[in-house]
């Protein structure tokens, strides 16, 4: 059965990079069949998998050619290790609602049977925080059963993670979605691991993996590749492989208990963090 996973996190936290490298590790090290559906108007959720090739977004095709032209063959691109990719895209700047675009895109993909039964994983890479109903769609309407939140030891990243949990709680009973854990994408902040471990435990989940910071991630990106494709023997590739393994084997799925603001701020003060 295909596992459908939504990846959330504060804008700029490294969510798309983490998601693409994890998907690449699943396909390369564990022979998993993976589909990535980018739900960000920037349309950068699949760039590394596709070797930097710009992908025509579903919303662009919808505007330019009409719904009848949207087929799996026309819109889905295949990249590294046969990972299938689609980007929702968004409206023209200053016009329309990008969240509405996410809803339209996922509905069209389902209508066209893009999420085939042979897939092991479908990833929805979702813009920033749960800022509106459209971006909450993967968890609101049960499109994804699992959520992983990318965070770091910076206050605003944890604040965003806590807000995402509030959105998840709102929809958990109607959609069945559950939190699988927090991925700490390290910013090399003092006591970062301890902070995220305590935060995760306090909301009833786990820090599923601590991803160390390594410049090879940037080197791979400059070469328009994931770390896995760039050098699958390096330490960072092994870290992404370990995160992939933990997600594959994960059995801890919870409805989180978000912290009240006073409790979150007290935890931040305890670790001496300011953003």
Swiss-Prot record:
Residues recorded with modification ADP-ribosylarginine: 100
Family annotation (PROSITE patterns):
NIFH_FRXC_1, NIFH_FRXC_2, NIFH_FRXC_3
Q: Known catalysed reaction(s)?
A: N2 + 8 reduced [2Fe-2S]-[ferredoxin] + 16 ATP + 16 H2O = H2 + 8 oxidized [2Fe-2S]-[ferredoxin] + 2 NH4(+) + 16 ADP + 16 phosphate + 6 H(+)
Xref: Gene3D superfamilies: P-loop containing nucleotide triphosphate hydrolases
PTM: The reversible ADP-ribosylation of Arg-100 inactivates the nitrogenase reductase and regulates nitrogenase activity.
Q: Which residues are [4Fe-4S] cluster-binding?
A: 97, 132
| Co-factor binding comment | Binds 1 [4Fe-4S] cluster per dimer.
Biological process (GO) annotations? nitrogen fixation
Show the SUPFAM superfamilies listed in the entry: P-loop containing nucleoside triphosphate hydrolases
One of the record's GO molecular function terms = nitrogenase activity
Subunit record text: Homodimer.
Q: In its UniProt entry, what is this protein called?
A: Nitrogenase iron protein 3
Q: Which organism is it from?
A: Clostridium pasteurianum
Whichever gene encodes this chain, its name is nifH3
